[in-house]
Amino acid sequence: MEEIQRYLQPDSSQQHNFLYPLIFQEYIYALAHDHGLNINRSILLENPGYNNQFSLLIVKRLITRMYQQNHFLISTNDSNKNTFLGCNKSLYSQMISEGFAFIVEIPFSLRLISSLSSFEGKKILKSHNLRSIHSTFPFLEDNFSHLNYVLDILIPYPVHLEILVQTLRYWVKDASSLHLLRFFLHEYWNLNSLITSKKPGYSFSKKNKRFFFFLYNSYVYECESTFVFLRNQSSHLRPTSFGALLERIYFYGKIERLVEVFAKDLQVTLWLFKDPFMHYVRYQGKSILASKGTFLLINKWKFYLVNFWQCHFSLCFHTGRIHINQLSNHSRDFMGYLSSVRLNPSMVRSQMLENSFIINNAIKKFDTLVPIIPLIGSLAKENFCTVLGHPISKPVWSDLSDSDIIDRFGRICRNLFHYYSGSSKKKTLYRIKYILRLSCARTLARKHKSTVRTFLKRSGSELLEEFLTSEEQVLSLTFPRASSSLWGVYRSRIWYLDIFCINDLANYQ
């Protein structure tokens, strides 16, 4: 790590901006093999589905071949000879692209560490569990009672190879690396395997996921620079504890660097976004923008985003990918949570001299609920219960040992409780727990060819109850409310950091 920092660290004499020579250094591939860089396995260096099965011997031979070859020998006429540098094209191209992604991540990682160090909460560097999904926690904790409209945005997907290259041209200075990037994209480009838009998220090819994830994250990072305009005149964009999460810190770091440039070049458009009181969050290819503004203002934002993305990225972006919903009339379905703003009526009796008055007040309250009907539908699809919520046995698990069966049911139960720990109402979770517990008992009774009552009487009902309620030592976050002293004691919701992705049962769409 120190050697890389010395190479990239600018000095008074010269500044090293060229990443291309690092491709020919063998220690780079060794670092990529064990996810090195000694920065606590940062999220930028760990991607789900990343294939870390590197062979250092193959890398050594590959580097030797790269030194010996004058140019890439690619056969386009004979499709049967799938060769790359005279050898297996798929294997070597994957090795080089993975190494390339690792190298280009280095300046991003160093910049991220420096931005994290500028905040007071430096303890974040000691956590191994932070993921981009955790940036949604403070969004769900924000005060939405004063907001009116919500924009549901599906981030546009790149339709041209050069768009992906241009997103990196500000960060990668040497043309050789950009040409190598173009080479990889032309090799792997396939609309069905690289990036597709059939779902709100994006799917990547099974191979080279690290390479494609890095390109996509860089592209989305560039798309989010659009919100510089929307935030410029607002003092309410930054959410509760905004300095506590990686993605938010990086997002605001980019805003601070670009706000002066954009404000100077495009002063005409800034008047549209005077004090918008907005909140923003993104996960995967879906983002949400909530604001206090009127419908006319939100509609202007919608067409502004469409026009900006069309002009800046040279793509055809349809207005149907952005939907405007009124927050008080629609429930938000985001990441398996059912969020809504409901009116909480309260009656206050006031007495003035001999007359008394009864005043009815309706206070808006933002709730994050557990969607019981879709969740039961997901359990029924996995054969844990019927569509009406009646628990049934799991026949495919009957061949497992008793401890494995209990462990699987207990893991599902704990994962759901951790995933929905931030829900404002947890009564639904206890119904889910009842379904899983009884389904586990029926599966065990089916295995031992007895009834549920007989099995529980013989083994003891405390066995299931004790296991399903056991907790593990998991890092968690809480966001205390600043107004808790005014409204009494606020019961902080707990957000667990062992959540890496949307729960499969919660992802019922």
From Swiss-Prot:
Top-level taxon of origin: Eukaryota
GO CC terms in record: chloroplast
Keywords: Chloroplast, mRNA processing, Plastid, RNA-binding, tRNA processing
Molecular function terms, GO-annotated: RNA binding
Alphabetical GO biological process terms: mRNA processing; RNA splicing; tRNA processing
Subcellular location field: Plastid, Chloroplast
InterPro entries with a match to the protein in the record: Domain_X (IPR024937), Maturase_MatK (IPR002866), Maturase_MatK_N (IPR024942)
Chief place of localization: plastid
Family listed: Belongs to the intron maturase 2 family. MatK subfamily.
PANTHER family in the cross-refs: MATURASE K (PTHR34811:SF1)
Role summary: Usually encoded in the trnK tRNA gene intron. Probably assists in splicing its own and other chloroplast group II introns.
Protein name per UniProt: Maturase K
